[in-house]
């Protein structure tokens, strides 16, 4: 089943996108900072969410990991 139609898979993809963008921005900030608008601006926005809401994103990742490992 596609991640678009399964809510848990969609949340997993969004969390992975946020975490990956925040990690890439911590390694090479200029890579994401030059595209703040347009289609590629989504990655910059995900990186900002990952930086500013870091504790909440971490808790969501842990909860998602436990739900995938133990509830399926």
UniProtKB/Swiss-Prot annotation:
Presence of the UniProt keyword Endoplasmic reticulum in the record: no
The organism of origin for this protein: Taeniopygia guttata (Zebra finch)
Keywords from the named record: Glycoprotein, Golgi apparatus, Membrane, Signal, Transmembrane, Transmembrane helix
The protein, known as: Protein kish-A
GO cellular component labels: Golgi membrane
Compartments reported by the entry: Golgi apparatus membrane
Residues listed as glycosylation sites in the UniProt record: 35
Extracellular side: 27-53
Family to which the UniProt record says this protein belongs: Belongs to the KISH family.
């Amino acid at each position: 089943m596609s991640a678009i139609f399964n809510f848990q898979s969609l949340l997993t993809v969004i969390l992975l996108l946020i975490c990956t963008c925040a990690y890439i921005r911590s390694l090479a900030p200029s890579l994401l900072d030059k595209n703040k608008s347009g289609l590629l601006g989504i990655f910059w926005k995900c990186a900002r969410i990952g930086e500013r809401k870091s504790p909440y994103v971490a808790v969501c990742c842990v909860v998602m990991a436990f739900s995938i490992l133990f509830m399926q």
